[in-house]
């Protein structure tokens, strides 16, 4: 199904507007052209059912609203009724617009005539001097311009303040992220400092141990020297044939040199280990700083992406809300139309029930009258046979079997020699020839036979 509504444009429109609305649900589209004041809306309803088309024209010469429907077994009866209702509503709307335009034109003609009659330069010479109002008008114009300028400045200041606040917010977020990264770096360096402090404590303990050992060796050396000096201070002369003794001074000097070399080697090893650890820590710190910078940049990009996605989400939510509102409005309109149609259906059903009731009543009356007619015809035939087949007497009774009217009288003779029985059938009919009541009167007269 394809549906298209097009509208024309008014030439005298000061600000034309253009809008379009497309609904994709079975190929339905609505399009509106430039319009203002709705001086003329042109469209045409044409429905193609196996190749036929139709169109309308209303609204003071403007084409009437319409639809183009291509139905190939896909259009149900409800949709036909809906499109017909839409067509009728659009036609009535165009009629009201045309009436309003005519009323506006009439008012414009009246205003123009009044100005021609009573305005400045009219034929009566009623010229008015409005020069005293010009300064007031200029003053008011200046005030309006000043107010507009001040409002524009205020709006500009508000926008600038909003932009400044946004900039400060971004700066605050960046500084907060930088502060957090620096705090993380400081915490990492504190752990490194604790490790270095532990290493320094171990080295101090080793230094104290070596110092105590050196002090102990010095003390032993001093005691040995004192013992040797005391032994050398006596006058005992002992001559011995023995190997030459060991020079203790040289031995102590050698031992001192070895310990000093050992201490220097330990110091160099500790310094090299410390430098190696410090270099590795510096390299790790530099790598962590680079990783932190890249992570900070990535975090900034992610924040920007998050803001963009939030904006898109807000726009999609607004679109969803507007679509829900339009859907609710459409449902309410169709529910109102459905309620109106149901009310009309109920009224028609009530009328149909009333018509059926009246028809049944008329049927019963007709059956009763038909029974009366048949009964009277049988009586007439019986009376004719009793009379003796006298057609003239039967015909002169003033009764016809197929004629019922107000005041019809049938006279039949039961026994011509003894008595005459007269039966009167009285019927009351209304203006529409409807039989209201039927009454049968029997009169018996006795007479002598000739």
UniProtKB/Swiss-Prot annotation:
PROSITE patterns: IF_ROD_2. The modification Phosphoserine is found at residue 442. InterPro entries: IF_rod_dom, Keratin_I. Pfam families: Filament (PF00038). There are two types of cytoskeletal and microfibrillar keratin: I (acidic; 40-55 kDa) and II (neutral to basic; 56-70 kDa). Essential for the proper assembly of type I and type II keratin protein complexes and formation of keratin intermediate filaments in the inner root sheath (irs). Plays a role in the cytoskeleton organization. It is found in: Cytoplasm. The gene is KRT25. Residues 1-20 are annotated as: Disordered. GO terms for biological process: cytoskeleton organization; epithelial cell differentiation; hair cycle; hair follicle morphogenesis; intermediate filament organization. Residues 115-136 are annotated as: Linker 1. It comes from Homo sapiens (Human). This is Keratin, type I cytoskeletal 25. Strongly expressed in skin and scalp, and weak expression observed in thymus and tongue. In the hair follicle, expressed in Henle layer, Huxley layer and in the inner root sheath cuticle of the hair follicle. Expression extends from the bulb region up to the point of differentiation into the three layers. Also present in the medulla of beard hair (at protein level). Belongs to the intermediate filament family. Residues 229-251 are annotated as: Linker 12. Residues 1-11 have a biased composition (Low complexity).
């Amino acid at each position: 199904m394809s549906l298209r509504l097009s509208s024309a444009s008014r030439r005298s429109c000061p600000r034309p507007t253009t809008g379009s609305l497309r609904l994709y649900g079975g190929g339905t589209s609505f399009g509106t052209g430039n319009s203002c004041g709705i001086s003329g809306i042109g469209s045409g309803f044409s429905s193609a059912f196996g190749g036929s088309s139709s169109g309308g024209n209303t609204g003071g010469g403007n084409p009437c609203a319409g639809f183009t429907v291509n139905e190939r077994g896909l259009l149900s009866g409800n949709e036909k009724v809906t499109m017909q209702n839409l067509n009728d509503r659009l036609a009535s709307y165009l009629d009201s617009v045309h009436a309003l335009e005519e009323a506006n034109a009439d008012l414009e003609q009246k205003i123009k005539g009044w100005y021609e009659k009573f305005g400045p330069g009219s034929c009566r010479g009623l010229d008015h001097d409005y020069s005293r109002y010009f300064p007031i008008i200029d003053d008011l114009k200046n005030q309006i311009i000043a107010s507009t300028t001040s409002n524009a400045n205020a709006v500009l200041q508000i926008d600038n303040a909003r932009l400044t606040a946004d900039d400060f917010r971004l700066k605050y977020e960046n500084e907060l992220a930088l502060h957090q990264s620096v705090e993380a770096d400081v915490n990492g360096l504190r752990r490194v400092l604790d490790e270095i402090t532990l290493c320094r404590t171990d080295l101090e303990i080793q230094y104290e141990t070596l110092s105590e050992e050196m002090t102990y060796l010095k003390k032993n050396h001093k005691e040995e020297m004192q013992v040797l000096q005391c032994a050398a201070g006596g006058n005992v002369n002992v001559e011995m044939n023995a190997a030459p003794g060991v020079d203790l001074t040289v031995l102590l000097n050698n031992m001192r040199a070895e310990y000093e070399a050992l201490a220097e080697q330990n110091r160099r090893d500790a310094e090299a280990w410390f430098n190696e650890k410090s270099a590795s820590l510096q390299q790790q710190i530099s790598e962590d700083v680079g990783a932190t910078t890249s992570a900070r940049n990535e975090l900034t990009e992610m924040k920007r992406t998050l803001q963009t996605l939030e904006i898109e989400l807000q726009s999609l939510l607004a679109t969803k809300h507007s679509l829900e509102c339009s859907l609710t409005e459409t449902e309410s309109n169709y529910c109102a139309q459905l309620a109106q149609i149901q009310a009309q259906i109920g009224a028609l059903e009530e009328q149909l029930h009333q018509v059926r009731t009246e028809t049944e009543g008329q049927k019963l009356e007709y059956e009763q009258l038909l029974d009366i007619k048949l009964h009277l015809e049988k009586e007439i035939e019986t009376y004719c046979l009793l009379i003796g087949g006298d057609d003239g007497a039967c015909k002169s009774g003033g009764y016809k079997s197929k004629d019922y009217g107000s005041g019809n009288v049938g006279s039949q003779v039961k026994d011509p020699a003894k008595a005459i029985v007269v039966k009167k059938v009285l019927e009351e009919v209304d203006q529409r020839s409807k039989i209201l009541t039927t009454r049968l009167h029997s009169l018996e007269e006795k007479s002598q036979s000739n």
